[in-house]
Structures are given as structure tokens and as C-alpha cells.
């Protein structure tokens, strides 16, 4: 027995086995278990408050979080050890929320309740042609919200894209908190440069729902340029950003620490998801041609095909061909069917060529708007996972006439740039200044349905612009102001951001009243519009929310739901931890009982076995208090082995060992017991 006790003493005190050892020495209430439980019960909010501003790249496919360490940004690894986190959210059969890799792993078996790529829906209307196109490509439901926005449905419940984004942001926030060891409440979040006002506002709402004070919304290409330019690099830079769901191109001038965006352009519905979908269509059609079976209606098969398409796309960036092998993809009367296709890089490039071609026009427009020629561009930065595709790099070379730089990590540069912007806002980084632009023209609808611009695209922000308008009819006492964003000449062809009325205008002949309309764009690119009757001084002002968008009440409700999810997650973690602790304790007790059964009375052994049985039964339930109670009871029961041995019942202990089996029997006495 001496050898047994010595080996127990050598074990890691942090293991739950130690509680069994403490029981053997006669402690009726193991301090370790109590301490572990109190640790589990401690809420997340006990972290000391920090004032770090984290940088988050909220991506369509993957997200990334970074923080400034001294003068340099550091990308933080998540709980799975990865530097990027899949922007995937799932609700399993128990209604539990899964985010990131765990959500992506179960997508094949739970396709209708696994939501991904919602960044493409954020700030969009349900009737938008792009939304309708997306609906045909995803296995989950996209539904029309009461306000007309596009929302998603999972487990019978509807969620706004901002909410789904908030679940991902919460994961990034927790990743940063685990690394920093303190709570985080401030963030800089990136968005595609070509996002309109509604999309920017919806992204800011997502941050609020996640419990973050969004200090700044920053454009992704600008963030990447910040990351690149940290090391005193200067010149005219083109940033080509092709990500999972969006495409942006920006021209920036870096000089003496000033990052000035000259122009930006893009396509908010072009990215890796479209490449996957093109490959998915090919696989479905190929299987239909060879097997005469249409897989497009089989959600489970489609999800397997989607995963295979994404994997093949990644592999073809470094190899010339790949095998797509999916056994038992479906079955018919003749039996199981398997999909086996060899895909070459040239075939893949042919399938996606029309998508790559779509990047050319925005690049040319951007160069034109910036008033620079190709030869003026000193360097081209590639950002976004899709820029690893060799054909994309070839097109970039053709557009800009020079090989793109590998100076930044395509997956991490944006988050690092966001962290740098956080450092600038906090005052830690003093030598850098960022001057960004508004991507789209802003204006109002005037007589005849004309779009009258007040602020042209690529105007440096923040900015403010006023213009005087008048009434279109005699004795008009109110005017409706329709706020629009876009580049088309007719108001109806542009994106309507919102509308409001200026009332109480004194009756007068048309053209006489003077109504001053002012547009104010802040550094986030978010618009405030005011209209003022110059004769009365009456003013009406709104911060633009699209006719959809989330109301304050809805945001508050979603914040509460997010807190509830966090509470449920904590309860689930507590349950798992206490079950693990109980499982380890059972193993230790049974091992001890096996070793000492013959040296203790049978009724003591029976009592221990019953306590273990009760603990096992409690473990199968979800009542944490019940498991804790049975765990304490089991530890108390097994302590009787120690009491019995120290009480001299085995006949081999010294006189000192017969002192009533006190709580803390000296260890030396046990070593005198012979087996």
C-alpha cells in the first residue's frame, strides 16, 4: 500500500483523481472539488475590465481577431488553435448554439439549421435580386422579415443577419478575452469598402448585439493597407480584395504615415461562395448526366457536395488536378450511388472564368476615379483567400501590369489593420493618419424622379455638404425627403436608404420656400441627413436607417437573446465540467475500491458502490446541483476507506493510527501498513 500512496502523491494535483487521494487520507469534504466547483460557478463577468480595442475582420467565410501588442498587431488563435474562425452558426437538435469549427463540422448532418455566408444578406431586402439568387444556392431558409429585410430561419426561429453576425462576433470577443485575460468591450470592425449605408449600419448593430462598443467601421482594403504600411512603406498602392463573398479594390497613397484612399470600387456579391456554387452546379449536372439523378433537391447531398467543392477549390490552388470522391451520395432502386470525378485546374478555371472576369471592370473604374494610370501604381496587394487562386493572380498581373506583392497574409491582414486602427483611436499609435472615402454617391430624389447628388463617390470622409431646394407645388406645407445612394441617374435605380418629412412649411408659391438639405457622413461612413426650412428655422434630422434595418427595440431584444445564449453556453460548460469531474472521481473511487475491498467491511464497500451508482445516475441528467451533491456524497463515502485504514482495522497500523480516524491522519502512518 505504501507504493500505492506514494504514486498517488506524485500525481498532478490539478487532476480530479487527487480528490480520491484526499478521501483516502480521511478528508470528508475534498477541498479540491469544492474549489473546482466555485471556479466553475464564477461568471464570465469576473474578468477584470480591459480597455483594449480589438480589431475584427467579420468575413463571409472566415473571421479573424487581432489586438495591438506594443506597436505591433497580433492575430489571436481561437479555442481550437486556429488563427481564423469559420463564420458559420448552427443550432443543433437540442437547440444549442454552435459557432465556428464545431458548427461547420456538423453541417452535413444538419444542413437546414446551419447558417453561413450571411454577410451577403446583411442590410439587404428580401426582394433584392441578389437575395433571391442566394436563396437558390443555400440549404437553409431565407425568409422575409416583417420590415421587408432578408432574414434566415433555423430550428423554426427567425434571425436577422445582424444577429448571426453577432454570434460570430461574440466568438471573436471571447477569443480575445481568453488571450488577454480581461473583458473586452471595444472593437473596430471591418466591412467591404463597397458596402452601402444600410449594410454598414447593420454591421454596427451586429457589434451592439454582441455587447461591443463599435469604435469604428473601417473598410477592408484600407485595413489591409494599414497592416502593409506599418513598416514605413510608401507609395501608391492598389489593394485587390477578393474574399468569401465580396470583392473590393482600392487605390491608396501612403506618405509620411498618412494613408489616403484615392478611390474605391467593388462588387458586394462576388467571392469564394460564387466559385463554390459554380463548382457545385458542375458536380450536380455531371452526376445527372452520368447517373440520371438530380441531386439539387437533396439538401444532405448538396451540403456534402458544397464541402467537396470548397476542398477541391483550395487544393487546385496548389495542384494541377484533384479527386472528388463522395461514396453513397444517394441511392435508387438499383442500390447506392457514388460520385467520383477527377477535376483539373484548367476545367475549374473554365468554370469560374466568368466570375474572375467580373473583377476587371471595378479595377478599371477605380483607377479612373483615382485619376491614376497603371504605371503610377507602385505595388498591388492581394487580400482575401480567393487571391490564392493562380488564375486570379494572373488576371491581377494583366490588369495592373505587375506581379502582385506577397507582402501581407491574405487571411489576416484585414484584422491586423483593424487592430492598428484601434491603436490609433486609443492613442497608442500616433504616427499614422487614415483618410478614407465614401464608396457611393449620396443624394435625394427631386422633381421627375431624378437622383440629385449632394456628395459624390470617393469623397474623403468625414464630410458634410448642404444644398438648398424648394417646393414643387403652390402652398406646399411639407416635403418628403428620399435619401438615396448609388450611381444611376434615376432615383428608382439607386438604393433608397430612408425617407422622412419636413413639416410646417408656411404656405407660399412654389419655388419660394428655401429648404436646406445637409448630408453628414461620419468616419464610419454612416450618414445623417437633416432638412431645414430657412424661413422658420424648423429642422428635421435622421440618422439613416433603411426602411428595413433594425429598430432600437429589436436591437435591445437581440442583445438580451445574445446574453441568454451566453448564459446557456456557460450553464452547458458548467454541466460538462462537473460531469467530467464526476467521471474522473468515479474512476478513482472504483480503482481504490478494487485495491482495498478485502481490507474494509462489506457494508462500507456496499455504501461506496451505492454512492457511485447514485452519482452515475445523476450524471445522466442535466441537474448540476444534483450531480454536485452526489459527487460530494461519493467522496464522503470513499473517505471511509481512509478512516478505516487509519483506524487500525486492518490490524497493521501503529498506535498512533488508532486515534479515531481523524480528518488529517499523518501520512507516515499509512506507509507502515503492509499489504
UniProtKB/Swiss-Prot annotation:
GO MF, one annotated term: unfolded protein binding
Protein name as it appears in the record: Heat shock 70 kDa protein, mitochondrial
Domain of life from the UniProt record: Eukaryota
Name of one Pfam family that matches: HSP70
Family that this chain belongs to: Belongs to the heat shock protein 70 family.
Region Disordered, residue ranges: 638-675
Gly residues: compositionally biased ranges: 648-663
Species lineage: Eukaryota, Viridiplantae, Streptophyta, Embryophyta, Tracheophyta
Amino acid at each position: 500500500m505504501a507504493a500505492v500512496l506514494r504514486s498517488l502523491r506524485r500525481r498532478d494535483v490539478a487532476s480530479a483523481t487527487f480528490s480520491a487521494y484526499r478521501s483516502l487520507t480521511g478528508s470528508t469534504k475534498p477541498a479540491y472539488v469544492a474549489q473546482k466547483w466555485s471556479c466553475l460557478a464564477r461568471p464570465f463577468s469576473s474578468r477584470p475590465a480591459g480597455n483594449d480595442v480589438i480589431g475584427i475582420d467579420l468575413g463571409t467565410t472566415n473571421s479573424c481577431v487581432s489586438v495591438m501588442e506594443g506597436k505591433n498587431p497580433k492575430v489571436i488563435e481561437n479555442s481550437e488553435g486556429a488563427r481564423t474562425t469559420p463564420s458559420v452558426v448552427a443550432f443543433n437538435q437540442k437547440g444549442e448554439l454552435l459557432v465556428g469549427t464545431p458548427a461547420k463540422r456538423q453541417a452535413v448532418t444538419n444542413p437546414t439549421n446551419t447558417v453561413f455566408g450571411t454577410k451577403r444578406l446583411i442590410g439587404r431586402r428580401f426582394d433584392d435580386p441578389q437575395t433571391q439568387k442566394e436563396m437558390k444556392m443555400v440549404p437553409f431558409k431565407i425568409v422575409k422579415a416583417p420590415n421587408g429585410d432578408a432574414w434566415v430561419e433555423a430550428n423554426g426561429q427567425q434571425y436577422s443577419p445582424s444577429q448571426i453576425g453577432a454570434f460570430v462576433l461574440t466568438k471573436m470577443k471571447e477569443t480575445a478575452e481568453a488571450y488577454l485575460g480581461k473583458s473586452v468591450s471595444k472593437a473596430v470592425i471591418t466591412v467591404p469598402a463597397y458596402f452601402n449605408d444600410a449594410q454598414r449600419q447593420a454591421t454596427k448593430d451586429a457589434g451592439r448585439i454582441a455587447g461591443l462598443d463599435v469604435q469604428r467601421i473601417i473598410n477592408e482594403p484600407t485595413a489591409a493597407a494599414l497592416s502593409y504600411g506599418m513598416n514605413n512603406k510608401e507609395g501608391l498602392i492598389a489593394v485587390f480584395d477578393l474574399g468569401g463573398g465580396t470583392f473590393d479594390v482600392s487605390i491608396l497613397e501612403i506618405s509620411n504615415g498618412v494613408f489616403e484612399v484615392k478611390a474605391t470600387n467593388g462588387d458586394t456579391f462576388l467571392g469564394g461562395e460564387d466559385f463554390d456554387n459554380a463548382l457545385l452546379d458542375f458536380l450536380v449536372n455531371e452526376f445527372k448526366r452520368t447517373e440520371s439523378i438530380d441531386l439539387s433537391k437533396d439538401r444532405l447531398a448538396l451540403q456534402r457536395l458544397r464541402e467537396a467543392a470548397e476542398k477541391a477549390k483550395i487544393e487546385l490552388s496548389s495542384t494541377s488536378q484533384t479527386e472528388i470522391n463522395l461514396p453513397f451520395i444517394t441511392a435508387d432502386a438499383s442500390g447506392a450511388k457514388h460520385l467520383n470525378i477527377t477535376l483539373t485546374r484548367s476545367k475549374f478555371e473554365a468554370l469560374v472564368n466568368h466570375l474572375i472576369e467580373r473583377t476587371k471592370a471595378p479595377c478599371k473604374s477605380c483607377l479612373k476615379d483615382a485619376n491614376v494610370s497603371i504605371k503610377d501604381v507602385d505595388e498591388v496587394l492581394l487580400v482575401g483567400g480567393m487571391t490564392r487562386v493562380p488564375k486570379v493572380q494572373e488576371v491581377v498581373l494583366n490588369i495592373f501590369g505587375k506581379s502582385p506583392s506577397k507582402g501581407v497574409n491574405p487571411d489576416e491582414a484585414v484584422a491586423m489593420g483593424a487592430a492598428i486602427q484601434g491603436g490609433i483611436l486609443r492613442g497608442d499609435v500616433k504616427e499614422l493618419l487614415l483618410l478614407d472615402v465614401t464608396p457611393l454617391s449620396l443624394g435625394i430624389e427631386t422633381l421627375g424622379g431624378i437622383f440629385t447628388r449632394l456628395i459624390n463617390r470617393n469623397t474623403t470622409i468625414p464630410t458634410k455638404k448642404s444644398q438648398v431646394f424648394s417646393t414643387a407645388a403652390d402652398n406646399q406645407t411639407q416635403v418628403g425627403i428620399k435619401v438615396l445612394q448609388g450611381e444611376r441617374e434615376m432615383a428608382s435605380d439607386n438604393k433608397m436608404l430612408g425617407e422622412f418629412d419636413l413639416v410646417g412649411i408656411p404656405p407660399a408659391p412654389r419655388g419660394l420656400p428655401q429648404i436646406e438639405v445637409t448630408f453628414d457622413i461620419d468616419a464610419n461612413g454612416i450618414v445623417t441627413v437633416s432638412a431645414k426650412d430657412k424661413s422658420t428655422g424648423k429642422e428635421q434630422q435622421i440618422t439613416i436607417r433603411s426602411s428595413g434595418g433594425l429598430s432600437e427595440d429589436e436591437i435591445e431584444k437581440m442583445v438580451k437573446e445574445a446574453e441568454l445564449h451566453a448564459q446557456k453556453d456557460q450553464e452547458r460548460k458548467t454541466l460538462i465540467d462537473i460531469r467530467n469531474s464526476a467521471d474522473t472521481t468515479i474512476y478513482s473511487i472504483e480503482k481504490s475500491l478494487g485495491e482495498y475491498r478485502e481490507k474494509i467491511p462489506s457494508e462500507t464497500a456496499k455504501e461506496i458502490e451505492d454512492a457511485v451508482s447514485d452519482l452515475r445516475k445523476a450524471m445522466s441528467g442535466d441537474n448540476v446541483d444534483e450531480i454536485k451533491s452526489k459527487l460530494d456524497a461519493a467522496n464522503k463515502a470513499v473517505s471511509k476507506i481512509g478512516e478505516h485504514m487509519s483506524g487500525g482495522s486492518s490490524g497493521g497500523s501503529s498506535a498512533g493510527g488508532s486515534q479515531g480516524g481523524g480528518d488529517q491522519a499523518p501520512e507516515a502512518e499509512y506507509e507502515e501498513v503492509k499489504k
